[in-house]
Amino acid sequence: MGKSRRNKDENDSNFSQKKERVDENTINYYRRVTETLNEGFSTDEDRELFLDNVFNQLEEDGPKVCRLASTSRVLEKLILDAQDKNILQLLKAFSQDWIVLLSDRFGSHVLQKLICQIPRCLSKISNEEDTEDETIYTYFLNLCNFLKDNISDARTDVYASHILRVVLQVLGGVNVGEQVVRSRLSRNQDKDGQDEINMDNFSPSDKFKKVLLKFTKVILSSETLNMEICSATNNPLIQTVLLVLHKVNDQKCQKYLKKLLCIPGLFESNEESLPVIAKDEVGSFMVEQILNLCSGEFYTELYKKLFKGKLLLYAVHPVSNFILQRLITNVKEKEHFEEIFGELCGYLEDMLAVNHLGVVTRLAETCHRLGCNQEKLLRSLKAAFHCLEPVERETKVAPLLLSLTTYEIYYGMTDSDVKKEDETDKEPPKKDPVLTDINYHGSILLQHLLKFGNPKQMVTSLLELKPVELKNLACNPCGSHVVDAFFQSKTIGEKSREAFVNRIKGQYLDIACNKNGSRTLEMIWKHVNTSQKIAIATELGKQEHKIRGDRFGFFVHKNFGIFQFVQRRKDWEENLNANLKKRKLFEEILGVDSSGNKKKKGSSKSEDSQLKLEDSDDEEEAKTKKPVLYKRKLGYEQTIPGSKKQSKEYQLKDKKMKHLLNEVTGKKKKK
């Protein structure tokens, strides 16, 4: 129903045009063009001659054939190989009627691909307005004028709005790429166009910048901006305008950001409710972008107006919790973070209970980045996973984080076991589980904790895992990055790394013959000393034929020089020492440490390289569904936790949090 209505709305646009009929001979011609391109050419001259002939034909056929599914693909491929004169030919052909392509499902992609090549063409000339290539410049400005004159239709058309976004990027000489905040589904469906704009050596002219400012004024001064911000078509366009303006003229960008904040009906709220825009599935993306782009001064103003005293409301809301994550990620002053952390740290278990794990990982990430509240966070996490008391439980925090389960669930304790422990202060006999499954969010959380200033408790807990559990960790897609963080951390000493290597003795072959394990083992190899490398090579050398015959182990066998180690150990050691000397010399010349990070002048420590971590929650699912508890792992059995269930589960302990969650989910107490 929704789909048909959307198509109907698009057809009602002034941009909609009927497609011209294309004869079969023309279609067959472009099919043969595809075959010829795939076969290749003997010389560059033949290829250039062929392309010239095809583009000469496209001057006549271009506007028609680009609107067909099969032939539009051919044109997109041709455009990537086109010379400047060919780009000019197509621009000339398309300029006869821009409207035909702007709203067409396939033609818009061809035009978008063509616009992406304009910076490449214009970067070759010093002044676009005074050269023979002036026509590319003027045809592009002609398209800009057409879009500006028809902005009301262009910004609401699902295809024309994409063209408009690419045009804005070319005008500003900025490729925003994936900086536009949107759903994961949208990101996957729209990977063409924007990522292919090559802005290298391209500096837009003053004329381009003036046109950009005109577009900005028209788009951000709309009388219906309050509705457009919550529109799936307009929201990415407005974000693109702000992103480009941020690079070209940040002063004006900050001015428009403040103007957005004054839009009536979107940002107003009281102490017990969230702003309308923060709860909207599309509008919330704009709030995230504002947090990304705002200056330090404006961040403070924004925090006081929208967030202060209401962070718990954001934390439990299925949409707004992503805004809270962005707020935490973008905080730069310790004073601000102290205030945010103080308001949230007492509710970590409650956030885990509603499955908003991203907020917790962002807190850990920022504690690491700003170097504050690290001990407080670790203590709160241990309390949330029920391993703070008794003291004996503290060493079990690593497997609890990695599996993302509470102590009682992980060790299979019953209600009677918990009650008995409370009465006697002694731990009853419990199961001895083996860690096999690693939770993605738990992995990210532990990676940050290992980078803290004093990760002693996490290191101790990790080293208490069984050798087979450490093997499982190294071979797991998520767990292997925890091992990376362990060896790359500047706050973990040589003795701890050596203890880890000794702990996994007997597991090297299994690790080396695993897809993730082989990569992890090579990373470990780079961070251990010569004696530890000899120990690893000795164990692998005993099974040299097995590791050499394995598809993954083969690379370890080659990179570690296992064959040479077995046959000519003395030569192997000499090569190893020579490589170490070269590496140290190379690091001294470049001024980097052993991990490849640049050293700070006047300081022996180098900044931690940030791990590339993805958004920790699935935005698409979380914004369209009610909070669903992770029953299999966490032991949840109800949609809203906090009922009279055993204390071993994560619970909403705070009455205020229960009340907030009831409001968010629409539940009211029975009288």
Predicted regions located by residue number:
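Eukaryotic gene-expression regulator signature that favors modular helical reader/repeat domains
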Residues: M1-K671
